[in-house]
Regions:
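Divalent metal-binding pocket/active-site signature
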Residues: 1-82
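H/E-rich (His + Asp/Glu) clusters that bind or coordinate divalent metals
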Residues: 50-58, 67-208
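Structural preference for beta-rich elements and adjacent junctions enriched in aromatics
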Residues: 208-259
Length: 259
């Protein structure tokens, strides 16, 4: 991937609570009860949390020419010092926010803001928003599937946390823990990088500029009635060709999509 200039999205470990006792004392008990296979506290089956993070650090160190996007805020949103020190050590490391704003929002907002401003070029907006047979907004249980209105409320809380200094409001995935979060009120120039510029910088190295538009890959999802399906159906399939840094295309890695 370093040779191709392709970033690697890497998921190592999970919330620290998934290694804590599997009982009602666990702050994520509601989530773990719904997803018992997410519990990794049995040392006979799973490595310790710290061992997984150490392995991640070794991989990033071993491949300095590869850009690693460490999802879920490097899966250590509970420990801002660890993430900050890792970003300091590794210029080829980025962290995304997927499903970790509830954890990040528990910290002192001034501390989080300082970290985000310091590493404003290395943090990516992300949600863990998934569309399979039902919406998944970061996490979920066995209740009714989320609605489009739930999705709007989910994003509103994401924006609120990043853009305002509001205090002690409910976070977007209460199944992940019963606490409130504090907004970090980032400056507009930092928000633009986190929302857009940092991702564009990663993707432009990999995709030809003419097709950097919204795309729908045919097998990705079924329209929910709000999309103009007739427009998508008439769109001409386009090839997204991955290229080496010297501009040489790699046709074997191309993806066909409607653009």
């Amino acid at each position: 991937c370093g040779e191709l200039g392709l970033p690697v999205s890497i998921h190592v470990a999970d919330p620290q609570a998934f290694w804590k006792p599997y009982d009602a004392t666990n702050e994520r008990w509601r989530e773990l009860k719904n997803h018992p296979h997410w519990w990794f506290g049995d040392p006979a089956k799973y490595p310790p949390f710290a061992e997984l993070l150490a392995a991640l650090d070794r991989v990033i160190t071993r491949h300095p020419e590869t850009t690693f996007v460490c999802v879920h805020f490097a899966n250590n949103a509970e420990d801002l010092d660890w993430v900050e020190q890792a970003l300091d050590r590794h210029p080829n490391m980025l962290a995304d926010l997927a499903a970790r704003i509830p954890e990040l929002g528990r910290h002192d907002p001034a501390r989080v803001r300082r970290l985000f401003v310091k590493h404003q070029d290395r943090i990516l907006f992300a949600t863990d928003f998934q569309v399979y047979e039902r919406l998944t907004l970061g996490s979920g249980g066995d209740g009714p599937p989320p609605t489009d209105e739930d999705a709007l409320a989910f994003f509103d809380k994401e924006w609120r946390w990043l853009e305002t200094n509001d205090r002690q409001f409910e976070h977007m995935t209460p199944i992940q823990g019963d606490w409130r979060i504090d907004g970090i009120g980032l400056p507009a120039d930092v928000l633009r990088k986190i929302y857009f510029d940092n991702a564009r910088r990663l993707l432009v190295r990999s995709w030809p500029l003419p097709v950097l538009r919204a795309i729908r890959v045919d097998k990705d999802f079924k329209p929910d009635g709000r999309l103009k399906e007739s427009v998508w159906a008439q769109a001409t399939p386009a090839r997204l060709e991955y290229r080496l840094r010297d501009g040489i295309a790699r046709p074997a890695l191309a993806t066909t999509a409607r653009a």
